[in-house]
Amino acid sequence: SRDETHYALTLQPRLALLNRSHQNAIYQDQSVPQIVEKILRERHGLRGQDFLFSLTKTYPRREQVMQYGEDDLRFITRLLGEVGIWFRFTADTRLHIDVAEFCDSQQGYEKGLTLPSVPPSGQQSAGVDAVWEMACRHRVVEQQVSTRDYNYREATADMNAQVDVTRGETTTFGEAYHWGDNYLTAGNVHDRHPAPESGAFYARLRHERYLNGQTRMQATTSCPTLCPGQVLKVTGGEEVAGEFADGVLVTAMHSHARRASGDGRDAAGPRDQHPGKRHLRAYR
């Protein structure tokens, strides 16, 4: 009706407020996690219960890091992304706050969630969480990554590193060459876990990112608790691709719903046949 008013709300974690703080600063003799923690604590007043670092590696101190004209959110996201640290958000039900969790390995994934594949039809039981409209996309990605840099203090040192994480996978092709990742040592390319911030470390990290784009999945679910950072497995018949059956990591969610009209008090329109429908994106 003409008297009807629509409202829109955007719900974001508290960390989103960091994009309102633009700074020019220099950080000396600190590692990436130390710089991030310093910004969260000293500049934004966050306390220990507001964030959690669950890291499996020890990151070296950098002589100098500059923040020039970047907002704090973009700055820490860039720094964390350089070394492969990712973050997600969880809820502390005791303190009633959101918590930012920073991780650098698969140990940070939340596992154990399994949902059935049930297409939306009259046979679907009300209130049963399910997955449908599953789709997979595949593409050819780079076969290996080469990195190169220059350390003026050891001008004759070999700073080349070449990594193929798949060790000869035939479905990949080509080489990605990266110069100037700003590392001081080449590292061991044969080590599965090379020294953090070495040439082999950056080469392996970059190749893993390319491989993450090799297979992408999308689906729709009615599960209200599913969120990025969780590993989802789907059970069912032939409609379930092997990637979903083996487990996929959820990287993005898009949720929407409609107001119910069953009680006669809602005049906005017909009842949504799939309340709480959520579109998810994932990779294997």
Regions found by a protein language model. Give the residues of each.
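Amphipathic alpha-helical and helix-coil boundary elements used as assembly
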Residues: S1-R284
